[in-house]
């Protein structure tokens, strides 16, 4: 697991591509997910992109998503709730390949879901990267500022 930590601002280009910060690319290159050699994930590696219920996008390395995918695959297609969860999870997921400049294409559907049209904030969150439209992230942070101590006290 890469251990992504930090916050960076980047812009979506006119073709809907997002530049993955170099320090994050180095992390997953060090972990073997993006070694520049041809693989099942393309020449320069790949990431799984997931729409989230809070309006952000989460980016996962294939090695991290593999464990989550196994858990989802283990759900029964004959149990209506488990089948629904599978459908909902895979409906909001795409795998994208990095190009040689370290960019990933984001579909119009995913950009619209996250309210992204230009600049983004990319948060390193240990095993994933979280992509936010800056004003949306600011709203979440400002709206939750008084809850940090209580949440940290409850879970740590």
Swiss-Prot record:
It comes from the Bacteria. Transmembrane segments: none annotated. PROSITE patterns: SPOVT_ABRB (PS51740). It is found in: Cytoplasm, Nucleoid. Keywords: Cytoplasm, DNA-binding, Repeat, Transcription, Transcription regulation. Signal peptide: none annotated. Pfam families: MraZ. GO terms for molecular function: DNA-binding transcription factor activity; transcription cis-regulatory region binding. Residues 7-64, 93-136 form the SpoVT-AbrB domain. Its main location: cytoplasm. InterPro entries: MraZ (IPR003444), MraZ_C (IPR035644), MraZ_dom (IPR020603), MraZ_N (IPR035642), MraZ_sf (IPR038619), SpoVT-AbrB_dom (IPR007159), SpoVT-AbrB_sf (IPR037914). GO terms for biological process: negative regulation of DNA-templated transcription initiation. GO terms for cellular component: cytoplasm; nucleoid. Belongs to the MraZ family. HAMAP family: MraZ (MF_01008). Forms oligomers. This is Transcriptional regulator MraZ. It comes from Chlorobium phaeovibrioides (strain DSM 265 / 1930) (Prosthecochloris vibrioformis (strain DSM 265)). The lineage of its organism: Bacteria, Pseudomonadati, Chlorobiota, Chlorobiia, Chlorobiales.
